[in-house]
């Protein structure tokens, strides 16, 4: 994976765990004292979200709440980034890309849970983290995946 290819393990602290476990996350934040937090954890499969909606919401929404709570309680975090998906937008089948002012929608459990994750991030930013220089969202899209596939097949 790209994490290994870039040798990031030697350049940063990375912890594998369950973001639904707030107590474990608190211990990790206490031990690591992170300055930058990039939240990419999720239940990422749309089809699975229909079969396991509770797990999807627990992971994508409450997992984000847990991470944001750890950021709120931390004195070390300088920046937080929540990486979500373009699936958060109301899909109007247009030929143009989405922009930040487009409406959130997310009618299936996965998409809706990621929209909720963004709302959690926004709420924590406005309610608790105004002093944090950066607390934002980044929406990945499948165009990046298609680009990578094209590059690998060349």
What is each model feature region?
Residues 135, 149-151:
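Conserved loop-to-helix N-cap of the C-terminal "lid" that shapes the substrate pocket in Rossmann-like
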Residues 1-139, 144:
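N-terminal Rossmann-like NAD(P)+-binding domain of SDR-like oxidoreductases, especially those catalyzing
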Residues 64, 152-154:
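Amphipathic alpha-helical segments in well-structured domains
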């Amino acid at each position: 994976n790209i994490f290994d290819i870039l040798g990031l393990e030697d350049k940063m602290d990375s912890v594998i765990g369950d973001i639904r476990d707030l107590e474990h996350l608190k211990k990790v934040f206490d031990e690591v004292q992170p300055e930058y937090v990039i939240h990419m954890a999720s239940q990422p499969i749309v089809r699975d979200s229909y079969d396991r909606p509770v797990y999807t919401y627990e992971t994508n929404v409450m997992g984000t709440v847990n991470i944001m709570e750890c950021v709120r309680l931390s004195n070390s975090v300088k920046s937080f980034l929540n990486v979500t998906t373009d699936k958060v937008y109301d899909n109007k089948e247009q030929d143009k890309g989405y922009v930040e002012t487009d409406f959130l929608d997310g009618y299936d459990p996965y998409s809706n849970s990621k929209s909720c994750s963004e709302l959690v991030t926004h709420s924590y930013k406005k309610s608790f983290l105004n002093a944090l220089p950066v607390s934002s969202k980044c929406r990945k899209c499948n165009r990046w995946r298609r680009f990578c596939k094209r590059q690998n097949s060349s």
